[in-house]
UniProtKB/Swiss-Prot annotation:
InterPro entries: DEAD/DEAH_box_helicase_dom, Helicase_ATP-bd, Helicase_C-like, P-loop_NTPase, RNA-helicase_DEAD-box_CS, RNA_helicase_DEAD_Q_motif. It is found in: Cytoplasm; Nucleus, Nuclear pore complex; Nucleus membrane. The lineage of its organism: Eukaryota, Fungi, Dikarya, Ascomycota, Pezizomycotina. It is an enzyme of class 3 (hydrolase). This is ATP-dependent RNA helicase dbp5. It comes from Aspergillus oryzae (strain ATCC 42149 / RIB 40). The Q motif is unique to and characteristic of the DEAD box family of RNA helicases and controls ATP binding and hydrolysis. Residues 1-53 are annotated as: Disordered. GO terms for biological process: poly(A)+ mRNA export from nucleus; protein transport; translational termination; tRNA export from nucleus. A motif (Q motif) lies at residues 78-106. Belongs to the DEAD box helicase family. DDX19/DBP5 subfamily.
Length: 487
């Protein structure tokens, strides 16, 4: 268990910056300022999050009580005040500049807050306010009336990665800043040789494996838990290992616990599984054709081979100046090689892969949020959920693919592609996604992506770098640039 810093300081520079590398070995400088003009999701505005995205979409409600009318005014709300919330939570919402519920929140909050508690399965794209919805529900169900209650876990939120867990903690601390006695703990993999101490907090945010281990070792008491939330639920229920861990965690919890599942995507087979994990649940769904990522110009670069990919990447960054960007790679070895080459060219970069210890990972993401590293090289650790408002370019150095041993051909991972490029152009901003293609198999996967999303990914000729520079710079400047995909 690791205690989090107060929300006000969560995005400040972290002294543990040994994974931030500059060409001359010096400490990087510069920070980015964020504004809190609008409601934000997933990170709070105070933590560098992006503004809420409110496109024209409708929210479909399916109630577990088939006799009930989902259009009844009881199942919709137009103001936070109408929900009968604790005034201190309303004060926290006001401090976060939450003026009114988002469309998802309008429908989700009455269902979540109703008593007796009912399970909820919500499918909602990033930037629609789902994080705030499940956090508000969790805070509303806490009993903080005694010191003992304040030290007893009552709400458990599971996330697939350490980074997303820390981001959720920041939202909880911002929203609950006026709740006396609110303590939040993280249950994430500890650094080498460190031991988890007993959790004495009312809210716990963590990863499934660590939470399961803590409960079994009695480091965390689970018999008073009232709410279980899975964020990025499709990823956790579908991914080998994580799904089993989630089931084992749930088996250790009270039978009457309220289960809340939220994710941007729910493939059919995962949705069927989710219905068993959260039985008799109310359901919220965005119409599938409305699931779009707006403001992202999709491009691809032809490279002759793997070595040419390295050279092309270095040349690309030699041309461009962007606020922040993320490079997604398949392996840790590729991440290390790219980091070495880019540092040699004078770029300030950070590398974040699964092999990095916990405190170092925290330092890397904090420095990237603060703008002290402009380029982040990562595997799929950051493909989901993480919100850094300054990211305007994502590089698919390796196209995401499904792990299918023995398959006749390589298969693109559509959901990971969608989540990856969703790191840029977030919530109405403009961004660029560039995929690298160096052989026929990679071209086939890129073509699969175009067919699946019914979109066109524009080829950029690397023989004409003036054209490359012109296209990308114009795209970033053009606030109307959009690429939409739906299915």
């Amino acid at each position: 268990m690791s205690a989090e810093q107060p929300a006000e300081t969560a995005s400040a520079g972290n002294p543990l910056a040994d994974r931030i590398t500059t060409a001359d070995g010096s400490k990087p400088e510069g920070t980015t300022e964020t504004t809190d003009n609008e409601q934000a999701d997933g990170a709070a505005a105070q933590l560098g999050g992006s503004e809420l995205n409110e496109p024209d979409y409708t929210v479909e409600v399916k109630l577990s009580d088939l006799q009930a009318d989902p259009n009844n005014p009881l199942y919709s709300v137009k103001s936070f005040e109408d929900l009968g919330l604790d005034p201190r939570i309303l004060q926290g919402l006001s401090a976060m500049n939450f003026r009114k519920p988002s469309k998802i929140q309008e429908r989700a909050l009455p269902l979540l807050l109703n008593n007796p508690p009912k399970n909820l399965v919500g499918q909602s794209q990033s930037g629609t306010g789902k994080t705030a919805a499940f956090v508000l529900n969790a805070l509303s169900r806490l009993d903080l009336s005694t010191e003992q209650a304040q030290k007893t876990p009552q709400a458990l939120i599971l996330a697939p990665t350490r980074e997303l867990a820390r981001q959720i903690v920041g939202v909880i601390q911002c929203m609950g800043q006026f709740l006396d006695g609110l303590n939040v703990s993280t249950a994430v993999p500890a650094d080498t040789n460190s031991r988890h101490s007993k959790i004495e907090s009312s809210v716990v945010v963590g990863t499934p494996g660590t939470v399961m281990d803590m409960i079994r070792k009695r480091v965390m008491v689970a018999n008073k838990l009232k709410v279980l939330v899975l964020d990025e639920a499709d990823n956790m229920l579908d991914q080998q290992g994580l799904g089993d861990q989630c089931i084992r965690v749930k088996a250790l919890l009270p039978k009457d616990i309220q289960v809340v599942l939220f994710s941007a995507t729910f493939p059919t087979h995962v949705h069927q599984y989710a219905s068993k994990f959260a039985p008799q649940a109310n359901e919220l769904t965005l119409q599938h054709e409305e699931l779009t990522v707006e403001g992202i110009k999709q491009l691809y670069l032809d490279c002759s081979d793997e070595e040419d990919k390295y050279k092309t990447l270095v040349q690309l960054y030699g041309l461009l100046t962007v606020a922040s960007s993320i490079i997604f790679v398949k392996t840790r070895a590729s991440a290390a090689e790219i980091e070495k080459r880019m540092v040699a060219e004078g770029h300030t970069v950070a590398s974040l892969t699964g092999g990095i210890e916990g405190s170092q990972r925290d330092a890397v993401i904090d420095q990237f949020r603060a703008g002290q590293a402009k380029v982040l090289i990562t595997t799929n650790v950051l493909a989901r959920g993480i919100d850094v408002s300054t990211v305007s370019m994502v590089i698919n150095y390796d196209i995401p693919e499904l792990h299918q041993p023995g398959a006749p051909e390589r298969q693109a991972d559509f959901q990971t592609y969608l989540h990856r490029i969703g790191r840029t152009g977030r919530f109405g901003r403009v961004g660029v996604s560039i995929s690298f293609v160096s052989n026929r198999e990679e071209w086939n996967m890129l073509n699969q992506i175009q067919q699946y999303f019914n979109c066109t990914i524009q080829r950029v000729d690397t023989k004409d770098w003036d054209e490359v520079e012109d296209i990308i710079k114009k795209t970033i400047k053009n606030t109307r640039a959009q690429a939409q995909f739906g299915r």
